[in-house]
Amino acid sequence: YGGRVAAKSACEQADVVDLSCATQIDFPPTSQISEIKQLNKVMQETMGVVRNENTLLNGIQTVQALTGNLPLLGMAVLKSALARKESRGAHWREDYPKSNDNDYLKTTVARFDGKQIQISFVPVPERR
């Protein structure tokens, strides 16, 4: 409800005459809601504070059965966590408890080529 009120207020106060705003929220079809709940559960179970290869692989296996953009994003997060074989900040792997600056002091990049997600690591630019 609050979102609709905010959207309506934003539309009323818009200073661009031709700006069209949607004041109705389109919720996903009921058939997708169960998949979204399943994705939510899997991500909470596998991407919590403590992670390891087995839980991440189980999460990947479950998410592979789901369709849509949200599961695709979840898959990118899971594969990124699996590829980073170290612990750093909020990413803590019990099977790799130490950080590894040599291999992973980098930004994780996930790319989707239309068929699969590719994970790579790009060096972090030096700070001046």
Language-model regions, residue ranges each:
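Glycine- and aromatic-enriched mobile tails/lids
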Residues: 1-128
